[in-house]
Structures are given as structure tokens and as C-alpha cells.
A protein has these predicted regions:
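A detector for small-residue-rich transmembrane helices and their helix-helix packing motifs
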Residues: 1-217
Length: 217
């Protein structure tokens, strides 16, 4: 249910913001406004608005496709549900709470590069859920490294290779610059996703290696 709610809320807020320029400007990530005018809400709200409908559709489609299997693991793993007392609200909803923490945390972490680099630039703005979606994609790669993904919707490659290509491409484009895309936000979001999993489920790292070794052998 959590993913459906995230998609619905993001779609509603994005459509509203696209129809109201003042609302869009109020919710965008503007590091200058965050740092100098304490408009801290922007580090989260920017992840729920998009520049156009294609941007919105692509991010929510990727979140839906990659997020569902992750959410299933979060909600079904005994290791997660036994972390806290199942009788209290947090414990009984631990899986969905972890997913929500991961997603919101990724939105915030993805904003960090811009906050550092553009804190004195009042003209810089950023928006979109791409940083959080990058976290979701890389967690999928970590949990299902040997599953098949389709590059450009046509070329079948294993998920772990897609993960490698992601980091190579985003790193190159971030260094190149001039694209108008916050590639550093994608990188920070993806790295956060991997770190999040390493913290809540260290076995996911060894499991990743084990699955790769099994595939090679």
C-alpha cells in the first residue's frame, strides 16, 4: 500500500504544482532559500513535484516497477518483523515504515550536493523524485542482482550490470556537466539506498556477493 500512496500523493502534488507556478516555486529545491531563509521543507517537497508530465510518469513508473518487489521483501522478511515488538504500531508496520524512511531519506540525501554547491546561488532550482527513485533501483539491484533488466527496453542485461552502468553513466555525466540534470542527486540517492540496506540488513551485502558467485559458477 505504501508505494501506491507515494505514487498517488506525488501525482496529485505534481499535477497541482504544474498548474500553479507559485506553488511550484514554493516547493522546488532552492538551496539559497533553504540555507539563508530557513525554508527547510524544500529538501522534501522537491521530491514530490516534477517539471512536466513525462518526468512524473517516468519516475513513478520506475518506482512502481522496482519498488514493489523491494516492498514485498521489507514486509515479509522475518528478520525485519522481529526487530521490534509486533504489538506496537511501529513494529506491526515495520516493513512499510522502513520503506517510507528509505524513500524520504533518499529525497533528503539527494538534495545534499545542491545544498553544498549552490547555497549562495538564488537562481538555482531543482525538482523531481529521481534521487529517491535511484535509491529504489539500486536496492533492487542489490537484492536481485541476477534478474534480467532491459536496457533501452530492448537489450537484456543482468541487474548487477545495469547497476554498474548506472554509476558509470551518472558519474561521467556529473563530471561533464551542462545537461541541466542533477546527476549528483542521482548518485547520492543511489549510494544512500545501498548504505541504508547495509545498515538495516547487512546480510543483503553478502547475499549480493553470494548470488553473483553462484551465477558465475
Amino acid at each position: 500500500m505504501t508505494i501506491q500512496i507515494i505514487v498517488l500523493i506525488t501525482a496529485v502534488i505534481s499535477v497541482y504544482a504544474l498548474s500553479s507556478r507559485p506553488a511550484l516555486e514554493k516547493m522546488m529545491l532552492n538551496p539559497y532559500q533553504v540555507v539563508h531563509h530557513k525554508q527547510y521543507w524544500r529538501v522534501i517537497t522537491h521530491g514530490f513535484i516534477h517539471g512536466d508530465y513525462l518526468h512524473l510518469f517516468f519516475n513513478m513508473y520506475v518506482l512502481w516497477e522496482f519498488g514493489r518487489p523491494i516492498f514485498t521483501i521489507f514486509t515479509n522478511q522475518v528478520a525485519f518483523t522481529q526487530v521490534m515488538d509486533g504489538d506496537d504500531w511501529w513494529g506491526s508496520h515495520l516493513g512499510q515504515n522502513l520503506f517510507l524512511m528509505m524513500y524520504l531519506g533518499a529525497i533528503f540525501v539527494a538534495s545534499v550536493p545542491a545544498l553544498i554547491k549552490h547555497r549562495n546561488n538564488p537562481g538555482y532550482n531543482s525538482l523531481g523524485a529521481s534521487g529517491a527513485v535511484s535509491a529504489v533501483v539500486l536496492i533492487f539491484v542489490l537484492l536481485f542482482p541476477t534478474s534480467t533488466l532491459y536496457l533501452f527496453f530492448a537489450i537484456p542485461i543482468p541487474a548487477f550490470l545495469a547497476g554498474i552502468l548506472f554509476f558509470v553513466y551518472e558519474s561521467y555525466m556529473n563530471k561533464r556537466g551542462g545537461t541541466g540534470v542533477a546527476h549528483d542527486a542521482h548518485l547520492f540517492g543511489a549510494l544512500y539506498g545501498l548504505l541504508f540496506m547495509a545498515m538495516i540488513a547487512p546480510s543483503s551485502i553478502t547475499g549480493f556477493v553470494g548470488k553473483l558467485m553462484a551465477m558465475i559458477n
